[in-house]
């Protein structure tokens, strides 16, 4: 008699991989491959269905009513045989090796044959390679191959690093129209403005015979009224390109004596701050205040004055993180509510400088509080601050308005800071739960891999560490000490530099020009007065100087730097009333 048994649903986990590996082996047997691709002098046996699954180009070819739909041998033209071979191997293995030597050819072939996955990963590889020597070429290549996100990020890199890019050979090869577009950009971050003029003259000197005729017109794109008068006078007296052209002399003289309408005249790098809960609100017992006060401002370091920006709409928040990318400000995560009723959020906000209004963007994949965020290679990274006992990471692409997960850091830390430096993400922190020692961890976007760096002289412990990158080095401070440390990634070495004048709690460490600004409050005296002074560190002189104070007694805030036209924002920051633009 047969017993009644439950049905058995059998699943072989390795089946899909085994099938692909088997098909890869069977490709060499002509009877078991149903099409052969002819590329140059190479013959590539393969299977129509697999090609069609990976490429809309091949899907249309084999599923449609074309001659190739019925042929056993299909010739492909205008593609490189070696690259097609790599694409076909990818179809069967899901593996691809992208290098600086093959990325352009591979991208062209993937674009020609419409392999979207390969196009995407090649685009990401190019994006992570961006630097001053190649951003112009990558921008043009991205436009040619339809990688518009890559082109946009390369253009943004140019705007943020114009002075460095202008010193490279690629800049000298720019076509006249592309140079004009570059010089005319309102968001070009140059300081001082004469850098724009010097870059233009360098471009013309590279080929004066063909380019000198364009100089008068291109001079109109330079904010000449912002160029120091001695510089203009020197050019008029000594520069042959100017002396040989009456049109150039007139443009230079008039441009410096008259304000050009419609052009931003006072682009300047400034410190921006979004404030959360303030001391007076905390003393009210954590209840929601009956009115809102200003919470978004910038500090004009030249005038030493705080000016109002449109309020961040989520008032009295804490635990959020602030980062700036392409002079747009991003605020992510955080908690709000009373001391007994708080919650983390996935919220993400952006303040696009052109629109000058706060807008919600795609929410994060994970709710985060007391996390870190930083800009790296045209994206925003959010690190840590989730409920899990792991440092979970995700990145935001402003071009697609989407978040994507990144592998977690190998070591768990709860007391940490992060910064992008030389194309990599550095995470410095410790955990009271597992180990007190600070650990230095590094994420490479190119290889999509984390590593733990054993580095000599890394400080043993810092309370609430804060780090920032400046001129290729990583600077580190903490709440519990005035000491300042600097890390050289190339030498893998830490060393001490000049100490701060004061302690700074719950603040930020922000690079601005060639200086580092530190914000944050400190309790002083027996009466417990709360002070919010700022300091600035000169890396050349190895010296700190006190530099004003925060406009409110914020117990929590976020800070970064952006370029904006200070002449367009003229309302002083008055913390006792809401700010409007």
From Swiss-Prot:
Family annotation (InterPro entries): BACK, BTB-kelch_protein, BTB/POZ_dom, Kelch-typ_b-propeller, Kelch_1, KLHL30_BACK, SKP1/BTB/POZ_sf
Pfam families per UniProt: BACK, BTB, Kelch_1
Domain (BACK): residue spans on this chain: 135-237
Kelch repeat positions: 280-327, 328-378, 379-423, 425-472, 474-514, 515-564
Swiss-Prot/TrEMBL keywords: Kelch repeat, Repeat
CDD domains from the UniProt entry: BACK_KLHL30
BTB domain mapped to chain residues: 33-100
Protein name, per record: Kelch-like protein 30
Primary gene name: Klhl30
């Amino acid at each position: 008699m047969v017993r009644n048994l439950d049905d058995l649903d059998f699943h072989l986990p390795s089946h899909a991989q085994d099938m692909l590996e088997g098909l890869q082996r069977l490709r060499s047997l002509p009877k078991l491959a149903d099409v052969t691709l002819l590329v140059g002098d190479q013959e590539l046996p393969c299977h129509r269905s697999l090609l069609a699954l990976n490429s809309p180009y091949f899907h249309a070819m084999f599923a449609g009513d074309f001659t190739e739909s019925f042929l056993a041998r299909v010739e492909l033209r205008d593609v490189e045989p070696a690259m097609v071979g790599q694409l076909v191997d990818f179809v069967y293995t899901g593996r691809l090796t992208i290098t600086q030597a093959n990325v352009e050819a591979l991208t062209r072939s993937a674009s020609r044959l419409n392999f979207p996955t390969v196009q995407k990963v090649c685009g990401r590889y190019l994006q992570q390679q961006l630097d001053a020597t190649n951003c112009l070429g990558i921008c043009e290549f991205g436009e040619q191959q339809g990688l518009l996100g890559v082109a946009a990020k390369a253009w943004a890199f140019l705007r943020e690093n114009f002075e460095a890019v202008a010193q490279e050979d690629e800049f000298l090869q720019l076509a006249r129209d592309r140079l004009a577009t570059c010089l005319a950009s309102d968001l070009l971050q140059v300081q001082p403005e004469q850098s724009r003029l010097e870059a233009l003259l360098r471009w013309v000197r590279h080929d004066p015979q063909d380019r000198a005729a364009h100089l008068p017109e291109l001079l109109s794109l330079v904010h000449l009224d912002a160029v120091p008068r001695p510089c203009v006078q020197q050019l008029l007296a000594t520069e042959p390109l100017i002396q040989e052209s009456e049109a150039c002399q007139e443009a230079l003289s008039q441009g410096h004596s008259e304000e050009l309408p419609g052009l931003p005249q006072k682009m300047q790098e400034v410190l921006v701050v979004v404030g959360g809960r303030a001391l007076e609100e905390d003393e009210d017992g954590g209840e929601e205040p009956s009115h809102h006060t200003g919470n978004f401002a910038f500090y004009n370091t030249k005038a030493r004055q705080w000016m109002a920006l449109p309020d961040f709409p989520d008032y009295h928040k804490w635990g959020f993180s602030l980062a700036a990318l392409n002079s747009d400000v991003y605020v992510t995560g955080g908690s709000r509510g009373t001391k007994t009723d708080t919650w983390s959020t996935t919220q993400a906000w952006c303040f696009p400088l052109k629109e000058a209004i706060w807008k919600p963007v795609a929410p994060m994949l994970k709710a985060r509080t007391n996390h870190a965020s930083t800009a790296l290679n045209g994206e925003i990274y959010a690190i840590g601050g989730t409920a899990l006992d792991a440092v979970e990471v995700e990145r935001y692409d402003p071009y697609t308005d989407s978040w994507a997960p990144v592998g977690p850091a190998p070591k768990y830390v709860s007391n940490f800071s992060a910064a992008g430096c030389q194309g990599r993400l550095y995470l410095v922190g410790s955990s009271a739960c597992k180990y007190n020692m600070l650990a230095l961890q590094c994420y490479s976007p190119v290889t999509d891999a984390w590593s733990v760096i054993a580095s000599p002289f890394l400080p043993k412990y810092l309370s609430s560490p804060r780090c920032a990158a400046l001129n290729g080095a990583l600077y580190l401070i903490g709440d519990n000490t005035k000491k300042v440390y600097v890390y050289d990634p190339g030498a893998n070495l830490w060393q001490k530099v000049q100490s701060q004048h004061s302690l700074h709690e719950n603040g930020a460490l922000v690079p601005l020009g060639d200086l580092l600004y530190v914000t944050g409050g400190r309790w002083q005296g027996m009466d417990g007065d709360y002070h919010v002074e700022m300091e600035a560190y000169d890396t050349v002189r190895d010296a700190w100087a006190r530099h004003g104070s925060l406009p409110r007694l914020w117990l929590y805030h976020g800070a970064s730097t952006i370029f904006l036209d200070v002449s367009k924002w003229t309302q002083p920051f008055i913390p006792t009333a809401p700010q409007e633009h």
